[in-house]
UniProtKB/Swiss-Prot annotation:
Residue ranges covered by zinc fingers (RING-type): 51-102
PROSITE patterns: ZF_RING_1, ZF_RING_2
Keywords: Membrane, Metal-binding, Transmembrane, Transmembrane helix, Zinc, Zinc-finger
Protein name: RING finger protein 223
SUPFAM superfamilies given in the database record: RING/U-box (SSF57850)
Source organism phylogeny: Eukaryota, Metazoa, Chordata, Craniata, Vertebrata
């Protein structure tokens, strides 16, 4: 008989990892920061003070940081473009979906400028950009009236079109003979005006000549008679006929 061989199994604990590696926290900015949507796999990370869609720095006019109900923050211009792209008349058309989590946010009746401004990011902006300028929506345009840079100058308006495309131009109306007759009538009226002006000018010229004619005559002839007097015939001496002798009766 062969004696059975006993094998003893000893549990070996797994090697412990370094505590410095296990306890290292993950950066929330690197985990939650979006990447550029145009280049997949790009390592560009959005700054907390710039929009994650257009990568433009926040300001106090059209790039005001607006916070959605999901606490994601984007600039006012990008949110206005998203709101303009929503279908009109459909359920949910009055809400803007978040580009990251797709959670809808109701748009106020005044439009995207009435959305909540992120005071947390606004407090981290430079001091001259913390005062939010009034921006309103006119149709598909974001409008603002910034203060003039020089004193005494009237403030102007600045507008940005956030619509998808420009409205189609109406077709040109077909031409009919009525406008042509209207043009002929206007031309005829102008011609009549010109004839009146010519007639008045001719009358004024005639009156001017009649008024200056005596002056011209006085300068040339020395009197107001323009035609020279006809020369007088020379005086002829008539010989007196001698009286004949008186005849006696």
């Amino acid at each position: 008989m062969s004696s059975g061989q006993q094998v003893w199994h000893t549990a070996v604990p797994p090697p412990r990892r370094s505590s410095s590696i296990a306890s290292m926290p993950r950066s929330p900015s690197s985990a939650g920061s979006p990447r550029s949507p145009g280049t997949p796999g790009s390592e560009r990370v959005a700054s907390p003070l710039e929009c994650s869609i257009c990568f433009s720095g926040y300001d106090n006019i059209f790039k005001t940081p607006k916070e959605l109900s999901c606490t994601h923050v984007f600039c006012l211009e990008c949110l206005a473009r998203l709101a303009a792209a929503q279908p009109v008349g459909r359920p949910g058309g009055e809400a803007v979906p978040c580009p990251f989590c797709r959670q809808p946010t109701a748009v106020p009746p005044a439009g995207a400028p009435a959305l909540c401004t992120s005071r947390q990011l606004q407090a981290r902006m430079p001091a001259h950009l913390r005062r939010e300028e009034p921006v309103w929506l006119e149709g598909t345009k974001l409008c603002c009236q910034p203060l003039p840079t020089t004193p005494g100058r009237e403030p102007g308006f600045v507008c940005v079109d956030v619509g998808l495309s420009k409205p189609a131009e109406p077709p040109a109306p077909a031409r009919d003979p009525a406008p042509r007759r209207g043009r002929l009538a206007r031309c005829w009226a102008r011609c009549r005006d010109w004839r009146r002006m010519a007639l008045v000018s001719a009358l004024l010229l005639m009156l001017f000549c009649v008024a200056l004619w005596p002056v011209q005559c006085a300068l040339k002839t020395g009197n107001l008679r323009c035609l020279p007097l006809p020369p007088r015939p020379p005086a002829t001496s008539t010989a007196a006929s001698p009286l004949g002798p008186l005849t006696d009766n």
